[in-house]
């Protein structure tokens, strides 16, 4: 087994808990919201864990021991110090108060150069804009032939449930191929088999805790949106979020904020529903969208603060 330092272990554990408690709700939240009343949390945990283990082990095999899917190619491994572990600690605090923080910015900012951070920011801004525009256009089309608030016919319900489980599985795998890098950054870039087994156990336990807590406070971002508890709406959100993430996954290996893509998708959807269906007044949507956007800015501000603290105060001659 690789020699692990204290700060490497602390940073990894904090990042693993924070990422699973914060970002995983983006991908599993709508699925949880629409299944909580008919499926036990242990069943959902087992299903999500199966996809999680496949994503980890496939990435490890396909990328020569690198579970980050090559997302850390431009962020070389460096000895983990206390200030690196500070980032996921801050993320943990923000998560507990329900702030949808960009884990990629907050965690990777402690390791990446300013050049890489600039590329991450530009890709994430593009992700928010593309997701919002895409969602607005898609839900404009959906509103032409489908009323999401109308109950699903009993004969169709089983097909929507199956479709949701399939789309959530693909979305969960695609998201993991993006955001596992936020945890793997604390680890050697090539993992041994015994270390991979230990990491898998930590991830599965963290996922169990998240399901037991029903997503925590971050889940409120999903629950307060229009009809997200309905299986049909949840399936459509998961499907188009998967399309957006897969596009950016294939675009290049620069890390990005999946949080920004998710919030952008929900913003575009809410605006489309308000504009084209009359279910909500458009002016009532802007405070909701604005609140989520401001919370994202809090996370970005914390990330910038960490960068300045490390590169200008703690290690002024570093990256």
Descriptions of predicted regions:
Residues 1-319:
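Multi-pass alpha-helical transmembrane bundle typical of ion/small-solute transporters
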């Amino acid at each position: 087994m690789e020699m692990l330092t204290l700060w490497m272990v602390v940073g990894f554990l904090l990042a693993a808990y924070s990422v699973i408690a914060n970002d995983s709700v983006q991908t599993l939240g709508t699925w949880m919201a629409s299944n909580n009343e008919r499926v036990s949390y242990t069943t959902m945990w087992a299903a999500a864990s199966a996809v999680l283990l496949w994503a980890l082990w496939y990435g490890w095999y396909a990328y020569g021991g690198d579970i980050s899917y090559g997302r850390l190619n431009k962020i070389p491994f460096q000895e983990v110090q206390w200030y690196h572990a500070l980032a996921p600690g801050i993320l943990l605090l923000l998560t507990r108060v329900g702030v949808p923080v960009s884990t990629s910015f907050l965690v990777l900012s402690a390791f990446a150069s300013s050049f890489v951070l600039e590329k991450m920011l530009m890709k994430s801004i593009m992700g928010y804009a593309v997701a919002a525009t895409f969602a607005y256009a898609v839900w404009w089309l959906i509103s032409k032939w489908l009323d999401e608030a109308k109950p699903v016919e009993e004969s169709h319900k089983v097909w929507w449930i199956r479709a949701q489980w399939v789309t959530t599985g693909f979305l969960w795998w695609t998201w993991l191929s993006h955001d596992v890098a936020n945890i793997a950054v604390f680890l050697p870039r090539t993992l041994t088999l015994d270390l991979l087994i230990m990491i898998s156990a930590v991830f599965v336990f963290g996922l169990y805790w998240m399901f037991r807590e029903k997503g925590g406070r971050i889940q409120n971002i999903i629950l307060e949106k229009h009809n997200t508890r309905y299986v049909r709406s949840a399936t459509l959100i998961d499907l188009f979020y998967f399309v957006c993430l897969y596009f950016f996954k294939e675009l290049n290996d620069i890390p990005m904020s999946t949080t920004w893509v998710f919030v952008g998708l929900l913003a575009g959807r809410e605006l489309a529903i308000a504009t084209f269906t009359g279910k909500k007044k458009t002016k009532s949507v802007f405070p909701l969208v604005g609140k989520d956007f401001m919370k994202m800015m809090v996370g970005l501000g914390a990330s910038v603060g960490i960068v300045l603290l490390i590169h200008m105060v703690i290690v002024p001659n570093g990256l």
